[in-house]
Swiss-Prot record:
Keyword set includes Hydrolase: yes
One of the protein's GO biological processes: proteolysis involved in protein catabolic process
Source organism of this protein record: Ehrlichia ruminantium (strain Welgevonden)
Stored InterPro entries: ATP-dep_Prtase_HsIV_su, Ntn_hydrolases_N, Proteasome_sua/b, Proteasome_suB-type
GO CC, any one term: proteasome core complex
Role played: Protease subunit of a proteasome-like degradation complex believed to be a general protein degrading machinery.
Root EC class: hydrolase
Gene expressing this chain: hslV
Identification of the protein by name: ATP-dependent protease subunit HslV
PANTHER family: ATP-DEPENDENT PROTEASE SUBUNIT HSLV (PTHR32194:SF7), METALLOPROTEASE TLDD (PTHR32194)
Catalytic activity entry: ATP-dependent cleavage of peptide bonds with broad specificity
Family per record: Belongs to the peptidase T1B family. HslV subfamily.
GO MF term list: metal ion binding; threonine-type endopeptidase activity
């Protein structure tokens, strides 16, 4: 995500992997203000809806908290219907003048679906169960895909936690807006 305003606090890399009836969303802990690291231990991954939904954000921190609140409201209105709640949030995001200015993206997941909600109000389900957002998102995504799609016996025995941690650490080595203080939330069936 491009940082348009150096006076806003940004949070960056979020990775979601769904594999073998488990889903993990992980986020790094770095918050940047312009080119300065303001915090190394921010929690950008949260549980919502009585711990049945996990979500992570990248982008302007204050904007992301606004979206968390809106999503919580939609989940209360549509319990157990994550896709519908996200589509309703996206509609509001596209139509509301204030929300359209928010600079954030989210990944949300429950036991059955993972979704990316973009800053344009799009709701996308990743094809292969792997999604990443933020400035280090492409690095984390590439590393996660390589680890998940490898066919040797070693990779088949890797835990989901190992894959997520390794991919996030690779992103942290490459992206200056990402650190290796990784926080994960997991839902298992």
């Amino acid at each position: 995500m491009e940082h348009k305003d150096n006076s806003k606090m940004y949070g960056t890399t979020i990775l979601c992997i769904r594999r073998n009836n488990h889903v993990i969303i992980a986020g790094d802990g770095q918050v940047s203000l312009g080119h300065t690291v303001m915090k190394n231990s921010a929690k950008k991954v949260k549980r919502l809806a009585n711990d049945t939904v996990i979500t992570g954000f990248a982008g302007a921190t204050a904007d992301a908290f606004t979206l968390f609140e809106r999503l919580e409201g939609k989940l209360e209105k549509h319990p157990g219907q994550l896709l519908r709640a996200c589509v309703e949030l996206a509609k509001d995001w596209r139509m509301d003048r204030y929300l359209r200015r928010l600079e954030a993206m989210m990944i949300v997941a429950d036991k059955s679906v993972s979704l990316v909600i973009s800053g344009n109000g799009d709701v996308l389900e990743p094809e292969n169960g792997i999604a990443a957002i933020g400035s280090g998102g492409n690095y984390a995504l590439a590393a996660a895909k390589a680890l998940c799609e490898s066919n040797d016996k070693f990779s088949q025995n890797m835990t989901l936690e190992y894959i997520v941690t390794t991919a996030m650490n690779i992103a942290a080595e490459i992206c200056i807006y990402t650190n290796n203080n990784i926080i994960m939330e997991k839902i298992e069936d």
